[in-house]
UniProtKB/Swiss-Prot annotation:
Homodimer. Pfam families: Staph_reg_Sar_Rot. The lineage of its organism: Bacteria, Bacillati, Bacillota, Bacilli, Lactobacillales. This is Transcriptional regulator ZitR. Keywords: DNA-binding, Metal-binding, Repressor, Transcription, Transcription regulation, Zinc. Zinc-responsive regulator that represses expression of the zit operon in the presence of zinc. Acts by binding two palindromic operator sites overlapping the -35 and -10 boxes of the zit promoter. Could be a sensitive sensor of intracellular zinc to efficiently respond to zinc variations in the environment.
Length: 145
């Protein structure tokens, strides 16, 4: 099979795997709480800092409306709470509830496990081969911009 066909199959497999997901994580989520990947990512963001809808949308590179929808679902599950900014009552700040902390930690661990798997895969190649792979991925990424 040609390299072009392999790339096409690889990207097709990624598209199928990532359909309707914000990110690609390997393995299964270990949390018993059923959340979308966007909701999980919001929890991970809020574990690091209190944030606004607009800031979350910016970080996730999704629309504020999509964030609002995800926040509403998280609030219904009592995983997040809202408060008003002390310096501007119009600004709504979102933060985690105690119930959400273990879920957010699990999502962060899932990220680390995925990165560790990528590192293990990379370690199967020599430094020179890793440089070629890195260059290829950089060029391929530029083609998508």
């Amino acid at each position: 099979m040609s390299l072009a066909n392999q790339i096409d199959q690889f990207l097709g497999a990624i598209m199928q795997f990532a359909e309707n997901k914000h990110e690609i994580l390997l393995g299964e989520c270990e949390s018993n709480v059923k959340l979308t990947s966007t909701q999980e990512h919001i929890l991970m963001i809020l574990a690091a800092e209190v944030s606004t809808n607009a800031r979350i949308a910016e970080q996730l590179k999704i629309s504020p409306a999509a964030v609002t929808k995800a926040l509403k679902k998280l609030q219904e599950q009592e995983l997040i709470k809202s408060s008003r900014a002390t310096n501007d009552e119009r600004v709504v700040l979102w933060s985690l509830t105690e119930k959400a902390i273990p879920v957010a930690k699990e999502h962060a661990a899932h990220h680390e496990k995925t990165l560790s798997t990528y590192q293990e895969l990379g370690d199967k190649f020599t430094d020179e081969e890793q440089k070629v792979i890195s260059q290829f991925l950089s060029v391929l990424t530029e083609e998508f911009r």
